[in-house]
């Protein structure tokens, strides 16, 4: 009986020990889940992901502008879609405002001579053809036409605003085209965007590769052009949050749409992740942020 009692006691002790271990494991898991699911952390992740999406949109707008420099604007075709009539037609087949409310200066204003500095001056503010208010100056230095392999366009800003957002930093586009596909490397260096309505800011650095995947055979008809974007970025904001991002499903940009229409970006912040989903090809300004599987709709 003593042996049986001892064995039973040992078995009971093992069961109790195992139960305590399981209870301890469950407690640890619940703590981790609670940490990742607090409203404050969810809000911080959503804020960082929204900042990422807005930064992408605003600096993509700079790419569009530098790519739309044509002979009617600057005396010669400098951009990659230069045959399109009118600045800011890119991404807007139904222009909001037909009145030109900006000035352009070119130095030297001699066709074929590079480098060439192009300054677009929006003055104290005007409503552009894509429906956005801009003011200040965009200053771009072209080493050659954007369609020439190896050409670079370096853009900086002087008191430049898009709606309520002040834009700072350096935007560089380099032509990396091959014999059968047009491509560009696009960098944002020390980018900063400040919302003057609430003084919130975000700093952003980005490295993206842009490939033209449709429309390569119709050089003089850009409306069928489609671009694939891959790459990564990192940023921080005035809320004290930092993050990094990676394109996990190539972003798709159509010439005929001013917004990214498809693709996914994974954002990482303090060991937490979010997924930014641009949709399935529909041309709209809506994206969805998924945090712990929960969707949050944002408007770009």
Residue ranges of each PLM-predicted region?
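Low-complexity, intrinsically disordered segments exposed to solvent
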Residues: 27-300
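Bacterial N-terminal signal peptides that target proteins for export
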Residues: 2-12
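A general lysine-centric signal
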Residues: 2, 26-27
